[in-house]
Amino acid sequence: MKTGTKTATANEAASVTAGSGMKWVGRAIRRLEDPALVRGRGRFTADLPATHHVRFVRSPVAAGRLVRISAPDGVRLIRAADLAARPIRPMLHKFNYRPIEQPILAHDVVRFVGEPIAAVFASTAAQAEDAADHVEIEFAELPAVRDTGDALSPDAPTVHELGNTIVDARFTTSEFERTFGAAGRRVRLSVQSHRQNATPLETRAAHAAFDCASGRITLTCTTQMPHLTRTAIADILGFAESDLRVVAPDVGGGFGQKMSLAAEYIVLVFLARRLQDSVAWVEDRRENLIAGFHSRDQRLELEGAFDADGRIVALSADVLANVGAYSCFPTTCGVEPLMAMAELPGPYDLRAYSCRARAIATHTCTMAPYR
């Protein structure tokens, strides 16, 4: 600690208000969450007991038509046809956004490996996992596109009927054409940012409990946006927002992966209402790797224009973002390419800038924000 600074205690930190005259700047504030966590007293979603445990049956193929789903007698199964729910519909009212819908559970077709098709529930997590292994799904496999190059080829299969280009944004400053054309030197560069998974220490998890007295549901889940989660789920399932409470307890890492609405959470709330009981789901590591939201996977074609002293004076960019099969809620699939467009000039005094940024759908896991 630097000489002259003062470390604020928890009580002092709580007393810093707009009218108190105290300021945050120049004060070393102690972390308030550490004592409970280092003593093993954290409160995590997976710690909550439940009557029923859920396991999702996921697609083993990237693209295919669902022909048949069957399960042995005694396996309690929820399919898309059983859900009284609207699809997830993120909206963006600019940048040539094409609205695409994500079903809560896949019906008719699957669009990426790991897409949830059905939900099995049982008395224990182990029983649910065993039961899910006995669910049989027959597919008619379809051609798949795995990257932006495949998706933009003239004869490419379309992930959605609207086409594979979901966002097409363009930005050019007024000085660009003149400055770029007059520059004496140019350098071209191709850059690829590979696909990533946040791999948080705690995977995604949800616990939904029905209160028989009030008819309300409490959803405890590993979300970074409890308020938007409540609004979206109530809207999708068609009941009053006041009938749903969403709690975000201690979360073992979010990094943006837990900032988007998970279809699995909607299934948990639906089941809690139908069973009028408590249900729980904890994602395993394999599920998280294949079906937890991914990030990055961008290709950038850059051309910089320089003056005689080697100073960059103009930049041209073409950004292609592989955004996967669906558009994440609430930020939409435009978040990655549009952030790249906004941040590419970086700290440079660069007033001549032109960029095209596209979000391209493929038969891969959906992209979401990542720090």
Q: What positions do the PLM features span?
A:
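Acidic, glycine-rich active-site loops and adjacent beta-strand->loop/helix elements
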Residues: 83, 223-226, 250-254, 283-293, ...
